[in-house]
A protein has these predicted regions:
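Alpha/beta enzyme core
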Residues: 1-16, 26-180, 187-218, 226-236
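Short, hydrophobic beta-strand segments that form beta-sheet elements in well-ordered domains
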Residues: 20-23
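Metal-centered catalytic cores of metalloenzymes
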Residues: 222
Length: 236
């Protein structure tokens, strides 16, 4: 996959590179060594996809991933705590991850972004999704992400709309711009256009770039390429 991204613009010079390659934490160093193009290394970390382990284990995994070259760290909200009503425990875990990321990246003289996956399919209600969105942003997330792609219900337009509304409200109050990443269940160019339209209408043009808006699904890349090129493309 890294080699394909490295060579992508040789085949499609008019297209931008994918913003990032997403791998498990233990592959960060492998991707860093093989990387020859300008893309970020994203890791799913802290006991992805369930987030079920000791906090110390999660923090150590994040620490090692950043040490080995991760540019972005995706973690899953501690749903066991959040859904049980212990929102402070869920928030504190995000704060601790944020602290570790900043400490390790700071020693390396760089910034590493934190994305918090809400797993909206398990949160179920717009109220829960909104509460989780604000919790993650206030605890230090640079991005909020819908889903792991590992449960029955992943990204939905309703969840995306709620999350984008929360991002807009948070920005209005704090001045901070938080990114948005729908993930899971997005497989066609039409799906991608739906989420693009939500972001454009709720958040505006300042979010329509790779720094503020991502898709967390690899298969949609071929669908978008195929739609624009008007032929079947199976590059990725």
């Amino acid at each position: 996959l890294v080699n394909k991204v490295n060579a992508f613009q040789a085949s499609y010079p008019e297209w931008p590179l994918p913003a990032s390659i997403c791998v498990y934490s233990n592959f960060a160093a492998t991707v860093k060594e093989a990387r020859k193009a300008d893309f970020n290394i994203t890791v799913v970390s802290a006991c992805f996809p369930t987030s079920q382990s000791f906090l110390e284990v999660k923090l150590k995994e994040v620490e090692m991933a950043v040490e080995q070259g991760a540019d972005e760290v995706d973690i899953v909200l501690a749903l066991n705590a959040f859904l049980a009503g212990d929102t402070e425990a869920a928030a504190e875990e995000i704060r601790q991850v944020r602290r570790v990321i900043d400490e390790v990246a700071g020693k390396q003289g760089r910034e590493v972004h934190l994305k918090v996956i809400l797993e909206t399919g398990l949160l179920r209600t717009p109220e829960n999704i909104a509460n989780a969105s604000f919790l993650a942003m206030e605890a230090g997330a640079d991005f909020i992400k819908t889903s792991t792609g590992k449960v029955d219900v992943n990204a939905t337009p309703v969840a995306a709309y709620v999350m984008c509304e929360c991002i807009a409200k948070y920005q209005a109050v704090t001045g901070k711009k938080i990114g948005f990443k729908p993930a899971g269940g997005i497989s066609t160019a039409a799906d991608a256009l739906c989420y693009y339209s939500i972001v454009a209408s709720v958040l505006g043009k300042d979010w329509l770039n790779k720094h503020m808006f991502r898709f967390g699904v690899s298969r949609v890349a071929n669908s978008i390429l195929s739609a624009v090129e008007q032929k079947t493309v199976s590059y990725f």
